[in-house]
Amino acid sequence: MDAAIGKVFDSVSDFFSGAASASADEFPLCDSDIISGCEKELAEAQDEGRKKECIMRLSWALVHSKMPSDIQRGIAMLEALVVNDTSAMKLREKLYLLALGYYRSGDFSRSRDCIERCLEVEPESGQAQALKKAIEDRIVKDGVIGVGIAVTAVGVVAGIAAAILRS
């Protein structure tokens, strides 16, 4: 019985700490060495085609970084790239990476917008569908936490009011 109660407390604790969603949020991470390599590769690129490939690799690495500043750099690069793209396949890839960047930076609304645009381009993309589910799960989780905080605040205020009225 104690073990069951312990599991319940652990799962509630994991839910509110974010650990419960870790499996849904497992996207590859990129370290600074890979980012540095991509930056070097871009600096050494001679022709435009090669530069575009290097920019895509660098933006991929940046949005997969552990560092929030890198993620923001990746988002900025991708936002600039999405505007000029006419190829559906490349647009899908850029929108996916942009959605992932927003997701990893905590901007779930923008992330959802980008992933929906991505799915308009390629509705059958399993990668995009998985990210959309992770986004929706996170939005629901944040909503539940927000409601929990609001209910707790109301309870505290009601408790204080009741204590004041009794005295």
From Swiss-Prot:
TPR repeats lie at residues 92-125. The chain crosses the membrane at residues 144-164. The keyword Cytoplasm does not apply. InterPro entries: Fis1 (IPR016543), Fis1_cytosol (IPR033745), Fis1_TPR_C (IPR028061), Fis1_TPR_N (IPR028058), TPR-like_helical_dom_sf (IPR011990), TPR_rpt (IPR019734). It is a single-pass membrane protein. It comes from the Eukaryota. This is Mitochondrial fission 1 protein B. Gene3D superfamilies: Tetratricopeptide repeat domain. Its main location: mitochondrion. One of its GO terms (cellular component) is peroxisome.
